[in-house]
Amino acid sequence: NSALERLVDAYTSSAVHLLMQRDMDAVAEAGRSPPASSPPRPLPKLRRSRSGSATELLQYVHAPLHVATRPSGWTQFRILSVRTWSNLVRNPMLMMAHMLLACVLGAVCGLLFHQLTNDIAGFQNRFGLFFFTLLTFGFSCLSLLTTFAEEREVFARERANRYYAATPYFASKALFDVLPLRVVPPFLFGSIVYALVGLTPTLAAFWRMILVLVLFTLASSACVFCIGVGIAHTSVASMVSTLTMLASLLFAGLLVNREQLPPAVRWLQHLSFFHAALEALVVNELRGLSLRERKYGVDIEIPAATIISSFGFDAQAFWIPDVLTLVLHTLAFSALALGFLTWPVSYTHLRAHETSLH
């Protein structure tokens, strides 16, 4: 005989097996006994074996049935937040890369656009600085696609088993994954570049610039996350995200003048978060600036608001509609992503339930 067969034979002839068999027979007999009129015959008291397996089994069978209740939304959010933060800490290179990129780009832009002048060249350099900044932070949000792609199977399995709802998961991802990587880098970049470039030297203008950069990054992140959740294939989601960014960039206002657009497509600028952010940054910096240019021995002074208007921007727009547009884009894409997180898993769970019934 093999070692496994000898082990089985030894267990079959052991006292532990005999006690276990007797306990199981007693439990089965108690289940078949008639209810109501006479109370069920109590099970015989068994001598506790050395392993204690038989007695522990009986205690488990006679113990009150505890039905596990689903934890509250706050408990789900707290547990998922701890897990999300732990995953972020275990992979510090991603956070360090975002922080280092923001600092390096801030230093490079500070050197390239050092102490801008109040002339036409300085006006052009300000436009270039803001456009490059939005381009950098917008396309850096594409890294969100791989973040959710790595968790898609785990999320689908856990949601199908009803471990947690979609809202706590989305909130934990937004608070402990999106915010550290999308809020801190714009603040670092803006803090470095603002003084080096020589932008408007007021505290209010500085914080307005930081606000616009943060809101733009959040809107871009929400857009990319929404596409990543809605499209299962990472390569397709990456292509759609890139095309969406380019389309929004096309209507930003620098590549195509709004006044030269056909009326049928002019409304598309209102769907461009690049346009809202660029217009807000330009208005915040240049609205009260006067440009002085000396050409052919003649000094010319031009209000920057006039040139802003010639580019198709609204010199009075900042809070409304630009900042409001960024907030609405963030909320709309977040709500759509939450809907994508909820609907497919619920549908899969429903189909699995119907299959099990049949």
Predicted stretch roles:
Residues 110, 166-168, 172, 176-258, ...:
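Alpha-helical transmembrane segments and their short interhelical loops
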Residues 109, 127-147:
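Long, hydrophobic alpha-helical segments
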Residues 141-162, 166-167:
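Transmembrane helix boundary and interhelical loop/hinge segments in multi-pass membrane proteins
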Residues 352-358:
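A short, hydrophobic C-terminal helix/tail in secreted or cell-surface proteins
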Residues 1-90, 98-110, 114, 246, ...:
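Topological signature of polytopic alpha-helical transporters
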Residues 117-129, 154-162, 241-244, 266-269, ...:
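Interhelical loop segments of eukaryotic multi-pass membrane proteins
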Residues 66-67, 135-141, 205-209:
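Short alpha-helical transmembrane interface motifs in multi-pass membrane proteins
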Residues 85-86, 119-133, 201-211, 304-325:
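Juxtamembrane membrane-interface segments at transmembrane-helix boundaries in membrane proteins
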